[in-house]
């Protein structure tokens, strides 16, 4: 099997992050068929990367500006059987690619996602930050499987798909978040969720697999360690989910979220209160953050749904 690894990049400010991401791909126990660096409409960075990495395939994003356009460009250029995506601010463990590839040996598997661990800029997790909400910083969260298991959708920065299947279903949708943005630009990260559900709907029997042995570390900036970002990201996720349900329907679009909200989050809040009673003051903060996170996400969903109805009418 041949795997093309795609890293989408956009700014020189992340040069050191990009360097570490590329280095981690070079240190894999199973080397990729090719490494593709897709540059998002930044000619200076494109030239710099071509000079620094002559062994890589360095190309310009030929689709609409943004991460989805970059991912689609990667699929267009790739010649491998599998396309694996790694965030430009992530570092893959040496056995990451090997574990992803092994996941495709399971029957019906068209996509495999790995485990993403946070690399905190402050070197430690904020005491108030609940594990149930690690998705707000692009990481695997409490409530996801702990062993290899089918899941509804993978997380975009640590995932692999059969190349032909991505093309068959039309790739990743660009800019689907614009109609609910409002006056403020927000990080609407719903593209991979919508893509995975759309793929499963169009190709019944297709399996998305979670493979916890495919591990990467994802860097979390100090700004993203703040409670203000946490709230904003939760609200943006609610807006995103309104879009996802418009595209793929409420039943599929909210199935995982309902289970998380009805079971995992209440247990997490109770756990935090219990830890606070046992002397861990941070437990109170985690319980509070779970309540706020759920409320802000729900409010975002309500606002997003209302904006979509207004656009339709």
Outline where the language-model segments fall:
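Short, acidic, metal-binding catalytic loop of nucleotide-sugar glycosyltransferases
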Residues: 22-32
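Short, flexible, basic/aromatic active-site loop/helix in glycosyltransferases
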Residues: 130-151
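Short aromatic/hydrophobic "clamp" motif used to bind/position activated sugar donors
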Residues: 83
């Amino acid at each position: 099997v041949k795997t093309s690894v795609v890293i989408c990049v956009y700014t020189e400010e992340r040069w050191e992050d990009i360097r570490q991401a590329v280095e981690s791909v070079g240190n894999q126990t199973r080397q990729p068929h090719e490494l593709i660096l897709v540059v998002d409409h930044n000619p200076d960075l494109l030239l710099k990367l071509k000079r620094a990495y002559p062994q890589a395939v360095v190309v310009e994003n030929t689709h609409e500006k943004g991460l989805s356009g970059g991912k689609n460009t990667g699929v267009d250029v790739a010649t491998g059987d599998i396309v694996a995506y790694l965030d430009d601010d992530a570092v893959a463990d040496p056995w990451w690619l090997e574990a992803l590839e092994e996941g495709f040996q399971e029957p019906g598997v068209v996509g495999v996602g790995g485990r993403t661990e946070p690399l905190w800029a402050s070197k430690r997790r904020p005491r108030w930050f609940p594990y149930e909400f690690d998705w707000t910083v692009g990481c695997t969260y409490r409530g996801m499987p702990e062993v290899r298991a089918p899941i509804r959708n993978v997380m975009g920065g640590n995932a692999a798909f059969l190349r032909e299947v991505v093309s068959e279903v039309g790739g990743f949708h660009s800019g689907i978040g614009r109609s609910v943005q409002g006056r403020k630009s927000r990080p609407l990260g719903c593209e991979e969720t919508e893509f995975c559900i759309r793929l499963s709907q169009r190709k019944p029997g297709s399996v998305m697999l979670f493979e916890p042995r495919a591990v990467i570390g994802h860097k979390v900036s100090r700004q993203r360690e703040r409670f203000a970002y946490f709230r904003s990201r939760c609200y943006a996720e609610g807006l995103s989910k309104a879009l996802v349900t418009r595209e793929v329907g409420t039943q599929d679009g909210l199935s995982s979220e309902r289970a998380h909200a009805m079971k995992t989050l209440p247990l997490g809040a109770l756990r935090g209160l219990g830890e606070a009673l046992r002397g861990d003051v941070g437990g109170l903060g985690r319980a509070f953050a779970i309540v706020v996170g759920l409320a802000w996400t729900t409010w975002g969903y309500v606002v997003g749904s209302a904006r979509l109805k207004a656009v339709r009418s």
